Amino acid sequence: MIARLGLTAINDLREALPRFTQVPLAHLPHLDIEQRRAYWLDEISQSLADESSIAFVSVASGRISGFVIYNDLPWDSQIIGRRTGTVKHLAVTSANAVGVEILAELISELMQTVGKRGTQCTVSRVQSSELAAIHALEQSGFLLVDTLLDFVFDFSRTPIEEITFPKRDGQLKIRHANAADLPALIDINEKSFSDYFGRYHADPQMPAGTATRIYTEWIRAAFQGWADWILVAELDDKIAGYGLWRKALRNEERNSVSVAHYDLAAIDPKSRGRGLWTALMLDGMWIARDFAQYLVGPVHVSNYPVQHLLQKFGWSISGARHSFHTWLKP
């Protein structure tokens, strides 16, 4: 049976969580299971409390066997120019064909509902190990648009002082960004991401120009408070690259998940190969060390140069996530 799911059912979900096949925060293997479930329940509660929330639960023999939760994405919607939302949570208690069927039914119910609301683009991101969710999304018409590898650096296992970094270019300077730097960083974005291979570029139905504009607005949002610190790299007193970093998110802080995030970096194509990306990473790591035990950085599966650099300097791959998009006719 498929039924609507609301915040009032949070206690039922709390009891059901141990039966689900999903592993929250799978890229952080040091966390114990209770810490993971507390974090997951916190996230679920926030999603259900969102006024845009649409959620359904599958119940069999009086027990929850799966659920799906959707939230609008207002920032994405504004940039894309289409109402966009995300399948924030998609979980099932069985990883076999029965689980796929349960999830497919939940997705079908959800898509009918968001279609009536006027949602045009729906996105979903799932761990690469969640095969039931992947197959259910594919059967429901979702298109795979990218895969991100979750890289993690553990300060307790690899002291940053023991890492051998290459000698820096004598003309290179790393500093904190200020508001006057924004135009230069936007220019670097347009050069770096015009032919990128991320999910916005991979989606053939994404409106023209949207893919690059997403990254431009991302850096603009960083200056408006989304990022906790922005570093810029200068060569010969000219900005040639940047990196965006965030401290632990609120939900991570509440559940004692001691992480910092290296979310985005870009180097002017003319300045690549001179060690800017490595220098930005190192200086950001020194800052993050004061308040985080772990660093997390998502890297596109096809971005081999960055993968090689991270592994060279002590980062390791701890997980992978697939991104899916689907479009509904207006």
Question: Which sequence ranges carry the predicted segments?
Answer:
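Conserved donor-binding loop and adjoining core beta-sheet/short helix segment
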Residues: L41-R117, V126-S129, F155, G241-P269
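Conserved acyl-CoA
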Residues: E101-Q120, A279-L295, H300, Y304-Q307, ...
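Acyl-donor-binding surface of acyltransferase catalytic domains
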Residues: V92-A180, A320-T326
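Active-site rim helix/loop that mediates acceptor-substrate recognition in acyltransferases
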Residues: T21-A55, M206-W229
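Glycine/small-residue-rich hydrophobic helix-like segments
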Residues: V232, I239-P298
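A short beta-loop-alpha structural element at the N-terminal edge
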Residues: M1-P24, K173-Y196
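Conserved beta-strand-loop-alpha-helix junction that forms the acyl-donor binding cleft
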Residues: Y70-N71, V123-A132, P269, G297-Q307, ...
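Phosphate-binding active sites in nucleotide-utilizing proteins
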Residues: R199-A202, A227, V232
